[in-house]
Amino acid sequence: MKPLFYVGAIAVTFMFWSSGIAKAAHFSGTLGEMAHFGLQPAWFFAAGTIALQLAGSALVVLGGRFAWLGAAALALFTLATIPLGHAFWTLPPEAAFGERLIAEEHLSVVGGLMLAALLAKLYGPKWPSRDATR
């Protein structure tokens, strides 16, 4: 079950770790993206986004005790991007359709992250409990 867990964890976090790597590699473009969405200071939000995407992904992929934290951080980040970048309810119908689909996909990703956190608890690497060290 562990190899399948890791394949699934890598897949469910792909959009985050690949984005984090791309944002770090093209930091000037990332600064422009943050400024486009009105996030100032842009360097702060760019660095925070990269750190969250990479660290959150690593926590989920590694599984174990803190996988839920990585999944929760990525899920909250994903939910926050809906009103920030995909506010379909503010757009005319012809423009709203695509943004609504992206928002719906984001909700599916959140569900996948919730399942990843659960599976990490059930099948991920086992960490010693406090009782086991006494």
Give the ranges of each region predicted by the language model:
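Extended, low-polarity transmembrane helix blocks
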Residues: M1-A25, W43-A55, L62-R134
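Short juxtamembrane and helix-loop transition motifs at transmembrane-helix boundaries
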Residues: A9, F27-Q40
